Amino acid sequence: RLQKIATMEELKGVLGTDVDMTVFRKLRLLESHTSYSHRGRYYTLDEIAEFDDVGLWSFRSVWFSKHGTLLATAVACVDASEAGFLAAELEAILHVSVKDALRKLASDNRISREPLSGRFLYCSSDPPLRKKQIRARQLYEAEAGFGPLPLGPGIRLVPDELKAAIILFFSLLN
């Protein structure tokens, strides 16, 4: 427990075994996480990981998620977003390439891939939420003065000015 992260080989050495399943059984008992970066090569304990507001934690450029795999993490981020994500935005948050993962999730209908201004916007597979995300993104992109969509721990938040504009827009529809 002095070491924050470890590989399978390191864990085998500590446990005195050559068998992966022995390590997996022990990890299951200890409530552990597998990295979503570095091809899942690293492990950490739940009590060590200090997840941020998005559910991410890194140590020495190795990334972990409270949601588990890269696929599960991408779905959680997309579903939590108020305006969906472009692939580059999600890559900036997750610190790994996400294009293949997003294509797989879209083909499995776990998220929705929507064309928008010559790019793809990744949204929730839930139709009402997806509709809100697309509207929020369209409205956001129509406002040239806002600059890029905020990322990082505040990814769930749309600027107050945009929220006011969305409320005004929806009130005009009724």
Question: What residues fall within each predicted segment?
Answer:
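Conserved donor NDP-sugar-binding/catalytic core segment of glycosyltransferases
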Residues: 90
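Long, charge-rich, low-complexity intrinsically disordered regions
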Residues: 1-80, 84, 95, 103-174
